[in-house]
């Protein structure tokens, strides 16, 4: 509280914007990472404020995902701390089921985010030793003053739109990002080019083919495609189990052998594997292997055509680097997402320029001066849950110690009053 008085004494404090003192941390982002952190803080008895730029929790899931989406991993690897999925949920919950789970999660732990508040800047005030988080909402500015700041905006805050020659200036067809794609129904009978071959690109291509779109998918570089299940068991679960006992290179070797037995060779279909194994590549770069849920069948049947990198677009065509020209009506950019942290967090010691913590897992959750990060480990919802537990315990330890000291001071003061009387 002394820090708060020191801040109020400065002229800058008395500005036109409204200021709010937060006893506990401010959590930026009401996605799964922010909700998990808030729930763990609630369990520790620590107050908090969650600010969210959208008008709902988990806005990526609610507003920027396609209709057919399901979790690609079994539900036990995707549940948040302190609340499992309902027993009646399938092994791979649907998008709607996952959203319902998150809403129930927020209700259970009394998480009430302050919606429609976009964080414009957050900086640590050296004079007061406090964080100053400035937000805007409908033109109104507000500043939150807090001791702890939890960055939970995630790895996928902003879509990535690559610069491709002629795409935005020459091409006359429809161009959308995968975050705007809902269903292949509107593209029935049309010639659609999907740019990107990650999990989203593969599933969008599958959905388009299922709706009888004439589908081509750009594959510029090598990619690991694994079956979602091997002999009825989750491929991810098998890899997690093996990594407990075996070195990473051997896990990769076994995974690739098993994948070859299930899927066969993919090189004849234009899908070349990287030289580095899938788990090692994930560990080194964060690049997730594709878990096949049906796209390979469409590729093998010719319903989805694999094409090389793009050279340029013209009015109704795309020219590829191998000289091919394709007639197309629409383009879906399955080109991924990025962190937006550098655009608003005024700090360079903990976060790098790409918006991810500089320290590798498992030390990427805590910075200095009360700064924390949840959900930036490139290890999915399980990694975000580990971050949330660590952050809440760390803040909770300080909170309980200070609460204990305050009670002791009050008790001493109370005894003095009695003795004087």
UniProtKB/Swiss-Prot annotation:
Induction line: Up-regulated by drought.
Cited Pfam families: FMO-like
Gene3D superfamilies: FAD/NAD(P)-binding domain
Enzyme Commission number(s) of this protein: 1.14.13.168
Transmembrane segments: none
Biological pathway: Plant hormone metabolism; auxin biosynthesis
One MF annotation (Gene Ontology) recorded for this entry: N,N-dimethylaniline monooxygenase activity
Required cofactor(s): FAD
Catalytic activity of the protein: indole-3-pyruvate + NADPH + O2 + H(+) = (indol-3-yl)acetate + CO2 + NADP(+) + H2O
Binding site for NADP(+): 196-201
Source organism superkingdom: Eukaryota
Keywords, alphabetical: Auxin biosynthesis, FAD, Flavoprotein, Monooxygenase, NADP, Oxidoreductase
UniProt binding sites for FAD: 29-34
Any one GO biological process: response to ethylene
Stated family: Belongs to the FMO family.
Job description of the protein: Involved in auxin biosynthesis. Belongs to the set of redundant YUCCA genes probably responsible for auxin biosynthesis in roots.
PANTHER family: FLAVIN-BINDING MONOOXYGENASE-LIKE PROTEIN (AFU_ORTHOLOGUE AFUA_4G09220) (PTHR43539), INDOLE-3-PYRUVATE MONOOXYGENASE YUCCA9-RELATED (PTHR43539:SF43)
Identification of the protein by name: Probable indole-3-pyruvate monooxygenase YUCCA9
């Amino acid at each position: 509280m002394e820090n708060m008085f020191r801040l109020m004494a400065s002229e800058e404090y008395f500005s036109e914007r409204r200021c709010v003192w937060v006893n506990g941390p401010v959590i930026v982002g009401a996605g799964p990472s922010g909700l998990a952190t808030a729930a763990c803080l609630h369990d520790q008895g620590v107050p908090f404020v969650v600010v969210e730029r959208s008008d709902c929790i988990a806005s990526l899931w609610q507003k920027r995902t396609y209709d057919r989406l399901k979790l690609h991993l079994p539900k036990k690897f995707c549940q948040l701390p302190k609340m499992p999925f309902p027993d009646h949920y399938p092994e791979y919950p649907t998008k709607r089921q996952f959203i319902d789970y998150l809403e129930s999660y927020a209700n259970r732990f009394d998480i009430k985010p302050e919606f429609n508040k976009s964080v414009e800047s957050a900086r640590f005030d050296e004079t007061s030793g406090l964080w100053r988080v400035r937000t805007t909402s409908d033109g109104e500015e507000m500043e939150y003053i807090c001791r702890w700041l939890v960055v939970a905006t995630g790895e996928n805050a902003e879509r990535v739109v690559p610069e491709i020659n002629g795409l935005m200036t020459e091409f006359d067809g429809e161009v959308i990002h995968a975050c705007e794609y809902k269903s292949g129904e509107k593209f029935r009978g049309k010639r659609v080019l999907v740019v990107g071959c990650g999990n989203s690109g593969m599933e969008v291509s599958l959905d388009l083919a299922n709706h009888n779109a004439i589908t081509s998918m750009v594959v510029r570089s090598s990619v690991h495609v694994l079956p979602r299940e091997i002999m009825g068991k989750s491929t991810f679960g098998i890899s997690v189990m093996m990594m407990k006992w075996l070195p990473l290179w051997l896990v990769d070797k076994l995974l690739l052998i098993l994948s070859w037995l299930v899927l066969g060779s993919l090189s004849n279909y234009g899908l070349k594997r990287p030289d580095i194994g899938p788990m090692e590549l994930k560990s080194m770069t964060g690049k997730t292997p594709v878990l096949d849920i049906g796209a390979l069948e469409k590729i093998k049947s010719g319903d989805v055509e694999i094409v090389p990198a793009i050279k340029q677009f013209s009015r109704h065509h795309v020219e590829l680097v191998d000289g091919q020209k394709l007639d197309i009506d629409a383009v879906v950019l399955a080109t991924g997402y990025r962190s937006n942290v550098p655009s608003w967090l005024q700090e360079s010691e903990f976060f790098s320029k790409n918006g991810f913590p500089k320290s590798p897992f498992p030390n990427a959750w805590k910075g200095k001066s009360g700064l924390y990060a949840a959900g930036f480990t490139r290890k999915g919802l399980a990694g975000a849950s580990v971050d949330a537990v660590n952050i809440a315990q760390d803040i909770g330890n300080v909170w309980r110690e200070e609460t204990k000291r305050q009670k002791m001071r009050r008790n001493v003061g109370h005894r003095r009053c009695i003795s004087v009387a």
